[in-house]
Amino acid sequence: MGKNVVVLGTQWGDEGKGKIVDLLTEHAAAVVRYQGGHNAGHTLVIDGEKTVLHLIPSGVLREGVQCLIGNGVVVAPDALLREITKLEEKGVPVRERLRISPSCPLILSFHVALDQAREKARGELKIGTTGRGIGPAYEDKVARRGLRVGDLLNMPRFEDKLRELVDYHNFMLVGYYKEPAIEFEKTLAECKEYAELLKPLMLDVTAELHDLRRAGKDIMFEGAQGSLLDIDHGTYPYVTSSNTTAGGVATGSGVGPMFLDYILGITKAYTTRVGSGPFPTELFDEVGAHLAKQGHEFGATTGRARRCGWFDAVILRRAIDVNSISGICFTKLDVLDGLETINICVGYKDADGNDVAPTDADSYVGLQPVYEEVPGWTESTVGAKTLEELPANARAYIKRVEALIGAPIDIISTGPDRNETIVLRHPFA
């Protein structure tokens, strides 16, 4: 029988999921996206060549791997088609292997306009969204007024529903936010073009996944963003609009939790965050600048600089519990090379010195991290392929993190290329 493996982020996103998905797809018949949209930015480096993917699953660069976009993903047709074109220009036969669930909600121009108008209106209180229409598209889905990919197949009905949606959202755009109205005819013309291009890619993804499962094929489920951005379990309201935790796999693909065999949590050896929201271990000194520079910490989707800080074992333990993590992949260990000492957050205290376990953004206010200091290392870890090649202090750091989080570190990434990896236990084994 084949195995179903989930790869997801355990922090605030940007943990290095794309590289690991690409590495593990050597064993997979299919890779599935199950939540989020083109707000994701998954960077792959193969033989020194960098590719950034936003909507298309990271298995696309592996010959013969089927790439599926499940019903939980919100699809911006213009962004998807641009991504397909870029890959085809590199010689990747995307349309042969990419299939999209007709149940995926569509992101259209008014969703983007609303997203950006809201962030503009919030001013300094903005959440820090990518401004790509993700949240408004999920809102339409939950309110049962949204248009889906499959609606493009019935254009007369689509036109009626689109007119209602444009009128509905223009009421807010013009009347409340004082922004320009979205043109119905222009939007309709764009959608007619999308319909012709997307029709050959539509497939009942849930049925396909169960066919693959029954045939004994290995399947990988690729998460976007990170567990602490989950709409339910993240640092609300500074979160994304989908379930980034393992529960989102079942709802976003139609494959139930009993069929998930291994959940791999991708975890940076330090911590980063993009945009607003609590970040207890954030560094504002030269160490923070070192992490940002060595880790090239700029968002693959937005280009925004990421906030950097020490590794936080408290938030990791929460992510491990919420996701039922089987094993951890520790990424960007090489970024810590050259640091004399390294801090690990092992708890938080409030103003009165009490131990606190925060559950939402407000409960982080005024908390101070409690650190355990461990020795760093001066030797390079870049490109190490066995545990024995790592400096003794790097191995000790990994062991200490394992003990603090209560989960095994099964994979260690020592560089951006797919071959710069130490695999201690393979998820598909």
UniProtKB/Swiss-Prot annotation:
The active site is at residues 14, 42. Belongs to the adenylosuccinate synthetase family. This is Adenylosuccinate synthetase. Substrate binds at residues 300-306. It catalyses: IMP + L-aspartate + GTP = N(6)-(1,2-dicarboxyethyl)-AMP + GDP + phosphate + 2 H(+). It comes from Pseudomonas fluorescens (strain SBW25). One of its GO terms (molecular function) is magnesium ion binding. Gene3D superfamilies: Adenylosuccinate Synthetase, subunit A, domain 1 (3.40.440.10), Adenylosuccinate Synthetase, subunit A, domain 2 (1.10.300.10), Adenylosuccinate Synthetase, subunit A, domain 3 (3.90.170.10). Its cofactor is Mg(2+). The keyword Cytoplasm applies. It holds the Pfam family Adenylsucc_synt. One of its GO terms (biological process) is 'de novo' AMP biosynthetic process. The keyword Nucleotide-binding applies. IMP binds at residues 14-17, 39-42, 130, 144, 225, 240, 304. Pathway: Purine metabolism; AMP biosynthesis via de novo pathway; AMP from IMP: step 1/2. Mg(2+) binds at residues 14, 41. It is found in: Cytoplasm. Plays an important role in the de novo pathway of purine nucleotide biosynthesis. Catalyzes the first committed step in the biosynthesis of AMP from IMP. InterPro entries: Adenylosuccin_syn_GTP-bd (IPR018220), Adenylosuccin_syn_Lys_AS (IPR033128), Adenylosuccinate_synth_dom1 (IPR042109), Adenylosuccinate_synth_dom2 (IPR042110), Adenylosuccinate_synth_dom3 (IPR042111), Adenylosuccinate_synthetase (IPR001114), P-loop_NTPase (IPR027417). Its EC number is 6.3.4.4. It comes from the Bacteria. PROSITE patterns: ADENYLOSUCCIN_SYN_1, ADENYLOSUCCIN_SYN_2. Binds 1 Mg(2+) ion per subunit.
